[in-house]
Amino acid sequence: MLEKDIKKILFSQEDIVTKTKELGQQLTKDYAGKNPLLVCVLKGAVPFMAELIKHIDTHIEMDFMVVSSYGGGTVSSGEVKILKDVDTNIEGRDVIFIEDIIDTGRTLLYLRDMFKYRKASSVKIATLFDKPEGRVVDIEADYVCYDVPNEFIVGFGLDYDEKYRNLPYVGVLKEEIYNK
């Protein structure tokens, strides 16, 4: 039923799991013995985080944030709002933000700077998807599974108007769906 709204599939579930496993193995090496705090940016990063933690073979802790810069459309508003902050004291902690996609970069620049101000020992960014063409600020992820074209993609947590997050793959949404 949802497939009819997808122009083309970019990454299958198998593709995503394979890349996520590779990232988990890298994080295991990079953070062995360090107990990093993984901060999942809700809602979109939930499937990525759930898959990723299965492949990290060292102690971790998790926390969650709700951050908004879209408000329901397809274009970032430019204003970052913290709707739910972390519960964990991050002072002196190694923090890894787990994000579904980096587009403009505004949200993660804001979060990175905020956590540095809160005296995190280190702040890194792991994203399933990076859209470099959309960037409007100077920020890069430390860990990227895939670079994606400047198209509106959905699935595996990515949504349009809270829909399509449950697709097990990632595809390009047909323009007529969001240009109604």
Curated annotation (Swiss-Prot):
The active site is at D103 (proton acceptor). The keyword Nucleotide-binding applies. It holds the Pfam family Pribosyltran. GO terms for molecular function: guanine phosphoribosyltransferase activity; hypoxanthine phosphoribosyltransferase activity; magnesium ion binding; nucleotide binding. It catalyses: IMP + diphosphate = hypoxanthine + 5-phospho-alpha-D-ribose 1-diphosphate; GMP + diphosphate = guanine + 5-phospho-alpha-D-ribose 1-diphosphate. InterPro entries: HGPRT (IPR050408), Hxn_phspho_trans (IPR005904), PRibTrfase_dom (IPR000836), PRTase-like (IPR029057). It comes from Streptococcus thermophilus (strain ATCC BAA-250 / LMG 18311). Pathway: Purine metabolism; IMP biosynthesis via salvage pathway; IMP from hypoxanthine: step 1/1; Purine metabolism; GMP biosynthesis via salvage pathway; GMP from guanine: step 1/1. Keywords: Cytoplasm, Glycosyltransferase, Magnesium, Metal-binding, Nucleotide-binding, Purine salvage, Transferase. This is Hypoxanthine-guanine phosphoribosyltransferase. PANTHER family: HYPOXANTHINE PHOSPHORIBOSYLTRANSFERASE, HYPOXANTHINE-GUANINE PHOSPHORIBOSYLTRANSFERASE. Its cofactor is Mg(2+). Belongs to the purine/pyrimidine phosphoribosyltransferase family. Mg(2+) binds at E99, D100. GMP binds at K131, F152, I153, D159. NCBIfam families: HGPRTase. GO terms for biological process: GMP salvage; guanine salvage; hypoxanthine metabolic process; IMP salvage; purine ribonucleoside salvage. The keyword Magnesium applies. Diphosphate binds at K43, G44, R165. SUPFAM superfamilies: PRTase-like (SSF53271). Its EC number is 2.4.2.8. Its main location: cytoplasm. It is found in: Cytoplasm. Purine salvage pathway enzyme that catalyzes the transfer of the ribosyl-5-phosphate group from 5-phospho-alpha-D-ribose 1-diphosphate (PRPP) to the N9 position of the 6-oxopurines hypoxanthine and guanine to form the corresponding ribonucleotides IMP (inosine 5'-monophosphate) and GMP (guanosine 5'-monophosphate), with the release of PPi.
